[in-house]
Amino acid sequence: MNEQSKAGLDYAARLLAPRAMSEKMLRDKLTAKNFPQEGIDHAVERLTELGALNDGEYARMVARYYVDRGFGRQKVDQELRRRGISQEIAQEILPGLAPCSRQVVAYLEKTIRGHYTDKRLLRKAAAGLYRRGFSWEQINTAIDVYCDPQLREEQETAADREE
């Protein structure tokens, strides 16, 4: 191992010490510091061997973060792509995410606050949910359930039985 490869590995290890990142993000940072491609490849290979660099685990962490903050699958998928996670890894993780119905209903409760018939508020809430990465199908279903007291009661009863 030459000096530049060792320096690249040391720098990469320092980058990964405080926070996780994807292989692409690490490669971009090392390239920005003008490390040679050979040194970058060596650092990535070695850190992957040691388990310090794991795109699958990083993707799961990012997905959990965004789901916990009320974002939908489309937003999670977009964020994984932005961070350099491969299509294959993203496709493994996305189906395992928790169902989003409670997040959609919570957002509707916060936005509509009991004004079930106000079309302007419903459109505003639907647009906000779409921007958060929920599909129109999920949004329309949630609005139907939220605005119909009988459906809402059935949904709450079913949710209580699941817990």
Where are these regions (language model features)?
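An alpha-helical, amphipathic repeat domain used for nucleic-acid recognition
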Residues: 1-163
